[in-house]
Amino acid sequence: MSIYISISHRYLLHEAGRATDKNAQYAQILEEANAAVADGFDGANLNIFDGNNQIDAWSAYWYSREYSASSKTVDDLMVARQDPREAIYNYNGADWYDEPSRLGLMTPGDKEAAGATSATNFPLWFLNGISGVKIPSHLMSKSELYFIIAEVKARLGQDAKADFETAVKASLADYATVGATEISNEDVAAYLAGETATKFAANPLNEILVQKYIAQTRDEQLETFNDMRRCNYLDGSYPVAMTNPNNTQAGQNRLPLRLPYGSSDVLSNPNVKEAFGSGNDAGKYIFTENVWWAGGNR
């Protein structure tokens, strides 16, 4: 039951921007999230990958093409915090390629790296189910639940430090299951007492969202996409800047605000067809029409 209660708080958090009484919404989220903790929630995971018949979807995609890469956007956040997860995230592929990757870390907008295969650094967990790495895939991680609790407390003006640290510890433990990299208790303590603590003290909500972004880089990027849209609507900004110059055109946003409808929906549903548009405007709604919980009308 704790799994279903926990996952429901994603949706309640998405709805906060639409809530007439946001504090009441946050209080409900906090009460129910704490109930999930009390009920023993430790993550909703798919622990089924055996390297034979079951291969993690992210790993299967990377393995078939080898052009997914570690991003400088994420790595810069880790380096600035002396993050022990950085070596796991920014793996140079030496043991896989038989030498360090040719192009290294991927900078957003780098067209050569974007078109290259077997040439960039990549997260070690891409070997999940392929090369002796057997780790779960998250439907919802333990760290996400505690980040939700920490965010809600910060928005309510409450002390969020303990829940924030629990969330970060859960993410560090999750990363440490990948490869041979060890993250000791001393490493964890030093990390939480270092630049991370300084940034949290300066702006708790900002650092909660940044650390959630780092944690969900593992395999929860869809929820990160939701957080970007949610926070841009709720706060007017998101603390991690997207720097790919190819995401703008003529000064207009080209980072999708929503996922597109499928062709069968467009063809068979007149309401969807109207939203999709026609001619030169066909499909542009994904860049201009927010989803309803992020301020849109559709």
Task: Identify what each model region corresponds to.
Residues 24-146, 155, 161-211, 215, ...:
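Hydrophobic-face positions in mid-chain alpha helices that act as interaction patches
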